[in-house]
Regions:
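Membrane-embedded translocation segments of transport machinery
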Residues: 2-6, 10, 14, 173, ...
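Transmembrane helix-loop boundary segments of multi-pass membrane transporters
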Residues: 35-49, 68-74, 171-179, 254, ...
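Transmembrane helix-loop junctions in multi-pass membrane proteins
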Residues: 27-43, 160-173, 192-204, 216-218, ...
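Membrane-interface "cap" regions at the ends of multi-pass membrane proteins
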Residues: 1-32, 60-65, 69-96, 247-251, ...
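C-terminal membrane-solvent junction of multi-pass transporters and transport-like membrane proteins
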Residues: 97-105, 146, 329, 333-353, ...
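Inter-helical loop and helix-membrane interface segments of multi-pass membrane transporters/permeases
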Residues: 4-7, 36-40, 73-100, 113-170, ...
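Hydrophobic transmembrane alpha-helices that form the core helical bundles
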Residues: 57-76, 81-82, 92-139, 318-337, ...
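Loop-to-transmembrane helix boundary motifs in multi-pass membrane proteins
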Residues: 9, 15-17, 23, 150-152, ...
């Protein structure tokens, strides 16, 4: 199979890692991780989460990077070639199955763009000072319960993100080399500021003290596993596209470990900001989206230089949101360019803008956005992720997968790596999918 046009490679190893970290770091790190940590035993949840990050970061993520690089293309082409590895007759079936995880990328992008639009509004209102003088709950309710309330922000987010994809891997790399370092710097600054709040130490103790009884609760294990799995963007789609742009000289397991490490650091630093701040003010750390748009603004209103800290907080969140959207959109764009080679990248990006805004503008209220994200998170994404896991470790020939993983590797990965993937990672992916479908749990 030929490579999709415009599928330029990432120029540097760190450019690839930062782009992958950008995909993985997102809203789930800022409100999802602290929320789940707060509800599932604090330090005990953290220990379980780290265990699964190591597993998925060493097995699942490298597999997706490797398959994309081996196929030389993204989602649709990679599934087709993986299934062809087993039998040429299976190629069409694999290509057809690839549409499901690809649809997951597009559907999650449609909903994700809405919440990033909320963040952009919060950033603008922080800069103007409006957010510092209002009742935060009323402010949030005013636009989150009203149709067509953030259209200008919505258009800016979608069009602005798609413009960063004009040059493919090259422009993705350049933007993430700026956004990701700034994201970490901003959250480190915020963490230092929060450390000075009275009562912050109580939040640190909660975070770092394991409540061992929580280890006996299967729900805690499932929650930590799901958070680790999807926080790393192991969805059977997006990371495959980035893998297609990775040099064959790079070690996919090594870059995957770095991606997992920085994604985990992002989650921990976000928790060091949010959990101690909430404990200091006696506020609920498990407030979901309200945490970002009601709880944190309320805290920022009360501290010196709160307007400045609010502005940099929401700027960091814009970086996290845009870098994640880049991966979702690029996965779809690359596959469409591969499947329909007569299309130009500009035409495809315009098409994505029309679809994203056409579907997303009608769900700008939380009451419509929530069910949409639940639909995607409970059904489409888990099934797509499981299809990917099964395709790599049960359909694709073992020798082909190991050759793909070992390309550029200084250390050979053999039967142990493969068997952990086949008999541990795949069953866990299927378990998460089953829990999502049967118990209607969104990870």
């Amino acid at each position: 199979m030929s490579k999709s046009k415009n599928a330029k490679r990432f120029g540097t190893r760190w450019g690839f890692i930062l782009a992958s970290v950008g995909s993985a770091v997102g809203m789930a790190n800022v409100w999802g991780f602290p929320n789940k940590m707060g509800q599932n035993g604090g330090g005990a949840f953290l220990l379980i989460y780290l265990l699964f990050v190591v597993l998925f970061g060493c097995i699942a993520l490298p597999a997706e990077f490797a398959v994309g690089r081996w196929a030389g293309t993204g989602t649709l082409g990679s599934y087709a070639r993986a299934w062809r590895s087993r039998s040429p007759k299976a190629e069409k079936a694999g290509g057809a199955l690839g549409w499901l995880p690809l649809a997951g990328s597009m559907c999650i992008a449609i909903g994700y763009a809405v919440i990033v639009s909320y963040v952009l509004k919060a950033l603008v209102d922080s800069v103007t000072g409006t957010l510092m003088t209002v009742d935060t709950a009323s402010w949030f309710q005013a636009f989150s319960t009203k149709d067509f309330s953030v259209i200008p922000y919505h258009v800016i987010v979608v069009v602005g993100t798609l413009l960063t994809l004009l040059l493919g891997a090259d422009s993705i790399e350049k933007t993430n080399k700026v956004m990701m370092p700034l994201f970490f710097i901003i959250f480190l600054v915020l963490a230092v500021r929060v450390a000075l709040l009275p009562g912050a130490a109580v939040g640190y103790r909660f975070m770092l003290t394991p409540h061992w009884d929580a280890l006996k609760d299967p729900k805690v294990w499932i929650s930590a596993m799901g958070q680790a799995f999807f926080s790393l963007s192991v969805t059977g789609s997006g990371m495959i596209a980035y893998g297609a742009y990775l040099s064959k000289e790079e070690d996919v397991v090594g870059v995957a470990r770095h991606t997992a490490l920085f994604d985990t650091i992002a989650a921990l630093v976000a928790s060091l900001v949010i959990i101690p701040a909430c404990f200091s003010y006696g506020l609920d750390v498990g407030a979901g989206p309200g945490l970002l748009f009601v709880t944190l603004p309320e805290i920022l209103q009360d501290i010196p230089m709160g307007r400045l800290f609010a502005a940099i907080l929401y700027m960091a969140m814009i970086f996290a949101g845009v870098s994640s959207l880049q991966n979702m959109f690029e996965a779809v764009a690359e596959s469409l360019l591969h499947r329909f080679p007569k299309l130009s990248r500009k035409v495809v990006l315009v098409l994505l803008a029309v679809v994203c805004l056409g579907a997303g503008i009608g769900m700008e209220t939380i009451s419509k956005w929530g069910p949409w994200m639940d639909l995607v998170s409970i059904y489409i994404i888990p099934i797509g992720a499981t299809l990917g896991a099964v395709s790599w470790f049960f359909i694709m020939k073992k020798d082909d997968l190991l050759a793909a993983v070992n390309t550029g590797s200084g250390k050979r990965h053999g039967a142990l790596w493969y068997n952990v993937g086949r008999f541990v990672y795949v069953p866990l992916a299927a378990l998460l999918c089953g829990v999502a479908l049967i118990a209607h749990v969104a990870f």
